[in-house]
Structures are given as C-alpha cells and as structure tokens.
C-alpha cells in the first residue's frame, strides 16, 4: 500500500492523508482543504499553456506569417570563408589600410598590399593561395584589416612553422607610439600598428607583435616583415638595429632588454621599416604617378633590380638610394606628402650578422 502523504492546514496543523484523498478536514480549526494530485497539477498547467498559445495566435499581426515565409525563402547566410592551410613552405600576410572616410585617411596603402602580392607571386614564387590579403576592398568579413583579423592572420602565418619556411608580413597604414608600461623599451615608448578599428578596439603594440610573430619561429624558419608606417623602426621589437651610413658603413645597436626576451625559438626574423621610431613615413606620387608608400615602392624596386640573391646590405643601400632620389625630386617641386622627408628605411633583426655577406632570399 502506498504511504500516506503530509499536508498542512492554513492554521499550521500537520495532517497525514491517503494518497488518493480529495479533501481533508482539520481537527483543530475544522477547515476543509481541497487536495490535488501531481497529475491534476500537470493537466492544469497544460490547459493554461494551450490557452495562452491560442491567445497569441488570435492576436498575432497578419503580416507575421508573410515575414516568416520571406525569411524561409531567403538563402542561408554565407559561412565565413575559412583561412587557407598554414602549412605551405612560402606564405604571407599583406595588410593595407586606407582608413576610408576618416579625417586621417591614406590613399596608397591598399595599392601597396596589392603590389607586394604581385612581387611575391611573380618574382618570389609564392603560391597565390598562400597569401592572405587584408584590405578594406576584400569581400570576406575575415579579410577586413580589423584588430581581431590582423591578430588572427599573424597567428595563422606562424602556425606550425618549420625549417626552410619563408614567411612574409607586410603592413601599410598608420603607426604610432604610446607609453611603455613594462619597462622593456630603452626610449620608454612602445611602437604600435593601427588597424582599421583602432579607435574602438585599440592598437597592436610591438610587445604583442613580437610575441605572436617572432617568438614562435623555430630553427631554420625565416620571417621577413616590411612595415610601411610611421614610428615603425622597432615595431617587431627585434633586439638588433642596423644603422647604415650614407657611405655604406654600418654598425649594430644592441637593444636587448633584461626584462623580456625578444628573440625567436631558433629561427630568424628581419624587419624592413619605413623609418625610425621617432620619424614619419612618406607617401608620394613621384614613383608611379599615384600615391604609394615610399617604403613599399623602394623595397619592391630594390628586390627587382638587385639581381639574383642580393645581400641585405646591397638591398638596403638600393632602398635608401631610391628614397633619397625621391626626396631630391620632391624637394624641387615641394609636393612631398610626409611630415618627415628625411626618413630612410631601417633594418632590424633577431641576431647580428654581416649584412654584406648574408644573402637576402625569400
């Protein structure tokens, strides 16, 4: 036999009744209490829900069904395009940010990225499908140069890197400086790249760029960065800076920090920057007749004219010569578009090396 169940009267008295009892009278206050089983409660709840659903259907706007039909007739949203496989021997990330519609917009950055792609494919043997382009002209949301997408692309570039991998990172856009808060900068300033949404999402500072792009490089892997932006000298936070004189002599400056390791995991990293950390880069129509980054143009021209396997020193001298030639021509007609026409390309590296003995190979 099923055990009795407990009920409580409104006066507080506890009573024990049979499971199938429908009423019970309190022996203290003589109040009669109606009893309900769990089945009765469930049935009542179902009736309430059913009635509420009918009420909603009666008062639903007539055009709602039409809206539902239209939504069902529309094709499903396009899935985000996946990134290409990161496991090719040659791969690149090219970012060009014009900041369209902003008061600080630029004119030649997207063209710079496209010119770099042509160089890598036509001259350096990079497969077209191993090059990730991030510009405002791209159709895929994943290819817009936002902070999130640039970070994701940088991680893709070095993911699973191996010996003999050749990796290229190019950025053409705005660069800037901000206060260094971890004490790893000699000048007290962090360098940063400005993605399209930097006003809301923030900049990408050199500490993070080094952590993502430089630190994971394994023995035998090689990264070349080409940065066409202001304040970009040490934007990869590489520890050695090559100071090249006009007569071709050079010396390495050691910027290693005791607070943080800025090298690789055995690989090699090189960066060609448009200018020093405290300088501005230039855009000029003198090279091609339309606005283009002076740094990007001089790099491409030097690679094309240097001959097979030039040294880093030869390449850097050719780049500086191209910039100086442009400066002379622009000084004559006064249409240089940068605030610092004296800026020249700068080479930084994860290690010191003989720039006139080491071959530049992508």
UniProtKB/Swiss-Prot annotation:
The keyword Hydrolase applies. It comes from Arabidopsis thaliana (Mouse-ear cress). Coiled coil: none annotated. Belongs to the peptidase C14B family. Its EC number is 3.4.22.-. GO terms for biological process: proteolysis. The active site is at residues 174, 230. It comes from the Eukaryota. Keywords: Hydrolase, Protease, Thiol protease. This is Metacaspase-3. The keyword Endoplasmic reticulum does not apply. InterPro entries: Caspase-like_dom_sf (IPR029030), Metacaspase (IPR050452), Pept_C14_caspase (IPR011600). One of its GO terms (molecular function) is cysteine-type endopeptidase activity. The gene is AMC3. It is an enzyme of class 3 (hydrolase).
């Amino acid at each position: 036999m099923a055990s009795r169940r407990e009920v409580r009267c409104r006066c507080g008295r506890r009573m024990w009744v049979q499971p199938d009892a429908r009423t019970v009278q309190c022996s203290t206050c003589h109040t009669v209490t109606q009893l309900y089983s769990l089945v009765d409660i469930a049935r009542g709840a179902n009736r309430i829900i059913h009635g509420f659903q009918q009420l909603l259907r009666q008062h639903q706007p007539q055009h709602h069904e039409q809206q539902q039909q239209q939504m069902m007739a529309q094709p499903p949203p396009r899935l985000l395009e996946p990134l290409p496989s990161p496991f090719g021997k040659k791969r690149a990330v090219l970012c060009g940010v014009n900041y369209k519609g902003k008061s600080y917009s630029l004119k030649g950055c997207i063209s710079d990225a496209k010119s770099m792609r042509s160089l890598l494919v036509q001259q350096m043997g990079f497969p077209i499908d191993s090059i990730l382009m991030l510009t405002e002209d791209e159709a895929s949301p994943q290819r817009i140069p936002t902070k999130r997408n640039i970070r994701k692309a940088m991680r893709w570039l070095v993911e699973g890197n191996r010996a003999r991998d050749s990796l290229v990172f190019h950025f053409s856009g705005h660069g800037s400086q901000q206060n260094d808060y971890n004490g790893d900068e000699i000048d007290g300033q962090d360098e940063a790249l400005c993605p399209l949404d930097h006003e809301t999402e923030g900049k990408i500072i050199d500490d993070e760029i080094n952590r993502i792009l430089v630190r994971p490089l394994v023995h035998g892997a090689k990264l070349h960065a080409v940065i066409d932006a202001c304040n970009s000298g040490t934007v990869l936070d590489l520890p050695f800076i090559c100071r090249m004189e006009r007569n071709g002599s050079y010396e390495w400056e050691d910027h290693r920090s005791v607070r943080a390791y800025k090298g690789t995991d055995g690989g090699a990293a090189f960066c060609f920057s448009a200018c020093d950390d405290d300088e501005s880069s230039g855009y000029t129509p003198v090279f091609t007749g339309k606005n283009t980054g002076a740094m990007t143009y001089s790099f491409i021209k030097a690679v094309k004219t240097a001959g097979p396997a030039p040294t880093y020193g030869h390449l850097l001298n050719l780049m500086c010569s191209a910039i100086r030639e442009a400066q002379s021509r622009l000084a004559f007609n006064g249409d240089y578009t940068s605030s610092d026409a004296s800026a020249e390309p700068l080479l930084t590296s994860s290690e010191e090396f003989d720039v006139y003995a080491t071959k530049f190979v992508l």
